[in-house]
Amino acid sequence: MKKLFLLLVVALLLPVVAVAQNAVPAYVVDSKGPVTNIRTAPRAKARVAMTLPTDKGSYEVLLGKVKNGWWRIEESIYEAEENQEIKLHGSKTGYWIHNSIVAFGVAGEQENFLRTKPSTRAPLVKVIHSDQILLHPLAVRGKWVKVVTDDGKYTGWMLLDRICSNSLTTCP
């Protein structure tokens, strides 16, 4: 009976651990209109669950599952300047945002590497520095995130612990 109970507990907790391990912190970089749309499904025609005013501050999000260029937002949204939590609302099917309007920078002063594959042994695509470039997330695999540079010139993998999801400051 104890084994069955432990197995049930592990089965229930495993998805929570998986989301936390594969989550990608980012911030919203949408300047195309007065609001950023958060959708109920991973497609452009999906119903808008909620909006974020683009002129009201900087928003940080935690991204989970990715599907066809759309990231599912996990947990709440944070308005960085006021350090306020914005509760997700308006959907029972999840909250989705397109990868073209979420991004992050690179942490620290040291060189950071974009690689062809999610491995420290993979060939380099580009060496980047913390204040040089904005990156958009495309995929996540374990402790690696696949990114494309804001100008679209480079695509590669980098370690998740090297990203900076704070739009107001550089990360150590």
Where are these regions (language model features)?
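Bacterial N-terminal signal peptides
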Residues: 7-15
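Positively charged n-region of N-terminal signal peptides that target proteins for export
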Residues: 1-4
